[in-house]
Amino acid sequence: MKSVRYLIGLFAFIACYYLLPISTRLLWQPDETRYAEISREMLASGDWIVPHLLGLRYFEKPIAGYWINSIGQWLFGANNFGVRAGVIFATLLTAALVTWFTLRLWRDKRLALLATVIYLSLFIVYAIGTYAVLDPFIAFWLVAGMCSFWLAMQAQTWKGKSAGFLLLGITCGMGVMTKGFLALAVPVLSVLPWVATQKRWKDLFIYGWLAVISCVLTVLPWGLTIAQREPDFWHYFFWVEHIQRFALDDAQHRAPFWYYVPVIIAGSLPWLGLLPGALYTGWKNRKHSATVYLLSWTIMPLLFFSVAKGKLPTYILSCFAPLAMLMAHYALLAAKNNPLALRINGWINIAFGVTGIIATFVVSPWGPMNTPVWQTFESYKVFCAWSIFSLWAFFGWYTLTNVEKTWSFAALCPLGLALLVGFSIPDRVMEGKHPQFFVEMTQESLQPSRYILTDSVGVAAGLAWSLQRDDIIMYRQTGELKYGLNYPDAKGRFVSGDEFANWLNQHRQEGIITLVLSVDRDEDINSLAIPPADAIDRQERLVLIQYRPK
């Protein structure tokens, strides 16, 4: 009966965090609008081989993540939940692997359930796992690889070992098809410390080639097909998206070596109090095969991405699955022997909630700031933000009331965040980061436009997805579409600032021409170097400028 209650509680937890509130949040640009539009175009065109954005070739990532996103929109429609359905599914599948692997290692159902809840409630997992990017997919394939390698090495027969390594190769191949060759580097680096300490080189050399073969066979059909259709895909993807992004001096998203330290700290909420103990206990018990394996899958990817020049918080998402398992194991030990870490965790959550309440007041219309984050007419959003942090502090306090029994309620600290964050986003943020908000305000003007031009790829993708059209023209800036715009068949999809006046004269009689520009909050739109317009509609950071036929 207790198991049934636990399962009902888990399903209610998943519904409140990962299902019910998702549609209340508008899509963020540039990431969510980009991936939403790529998948919409895939469904509309029926081309499941070559990814396109705004009708242009888009070679930043391989195809598998777009397949899953497209299936999400196909099943649930072109709406906010449909766009995020794929990443939510991947996150829940990863959580299922956490459950299974924990059960496999320790044969403890309570520990397995706790590891799952910890994983799903970690701030970084929840933030990325409900956000339409490709990282939850690659995290799933990496965690699946972690489980597959363990299965292979624990098998007692050659058939079991062969099956495990073949499965490992498939997960690596799908990882390559999701985000590239990092899906090969991370597993290799993660298993080497364990193989070395356990002296299992023989099995690795005997059966490892099976993983290589199955990986190649997984990638080969699509890899050959896209090479035939787009011969320069693999050159661009390998050189620009791997070497330049991660290793060269001009790498994207450059950050210092210690960049991931605050990411790990913030990402571990509401279980931050368990982090030092989980890592220390894992190191202290490193002679235990399972513990050192999980520790290696936590630390090695973190070190790898710390050394790389380009860094983003999403890159280390896969580290948190083994970390959640270590945290759960340590938490049960602490509850049984010395609950000090659990008390510290409760106080950390109280401090975080109280700090958030104070910070919300400071940036509210009633605070000391001259330019508050929220305006007076947005008072309900301020109260939503207060509720988020109040609930966080409340559950932090509740875990301290009887710490040996109530400490696990820390999983409910982010409940307010899950339910209310979509209602607390300030208008000034929505106007710049949520193109859907802009489209809703300007729908009547945008809909009849013959041509729409914009200077932001993220805004362009948002407009294209909301209006169900892929012919948005880039104005002044090419951004990440630069490569796709270089193709001969992309002629006419970019208009420079100097060319705009002539372009306008040539196309004005064809219908309404709409220009959507991103501007600074205090920028005078009358100073823009554009021809006089027939209509201007400013929505704070985004401006709609229209030219009608004469």
UniProtKB/Swiss-Prot annotation:
Coiled coil: none
Native species: Escherichia coli O157:H7 (strain EC4115 / EHEC)
One example of a Gene Ontology biological process annotation: lipopolysaccharide biosynthetic process
Pfam families: PMT
Keywords: Cell inner membrane, Cell membrane, Glycosyltransferase, Lipid A biosynthesis, Lipid biosynthesis, Lipid metabolism, Lipopolysaccharide biosynthesis, Membrane, Transferase, Transmembrane, Transmembrane helix
Record flagged with keyword Glycoprotein: no
Membrane topology of the entry: Multi-pass membrane protein
Listed transmembrane segments: 7-27, 81-101, 111-133, 137-154, 165-185, 204-224, 255-275, 288-308, 315-335, 346-366, 382-402, 406-426
NCBIfam families per UniProt: PRK13279.1
Role played: Catalyzes the transfer of the L-Ara4N moiety of the glycolipid undecaprenyl phosphate-alpha-L-Ara4N to lipid A. The modified arabinose is attached to lipid A and is required for resistance to polymyxin and cationic antimicrobial peptides.
Protein name: Undecaprenyl phosphate-alpha-4-amino-4-deoxy-L-arabinose arabinosyl transferase
Entry EC number(s): 2.4.2.43
Superkingdom of origin organism: Bacteria
Record's GO cellular component terms: plasma membrane
Entry's family note: Belongs to the glycosyltransferase 83 family.
Swiss-Prot/TrEMBL catalytic activity: 4-amino-4-deoxy-alpha-L-arabinopyranosyl di-trans,octa-cis-undecaprenyl phosphate + lipid IVA = lipid IIA + di-trans,octa-cis-undecaprenyl phosphate
Record InterPro entries: ArnT_tfrase, Glyco_trans_39/83, LipidA_mod_glycosyltrf_83
Pathway: Lipopolysaccharide metabolism; 4-amino-4-deoxy-beta-L-arabinose-lipid A biosynthesis
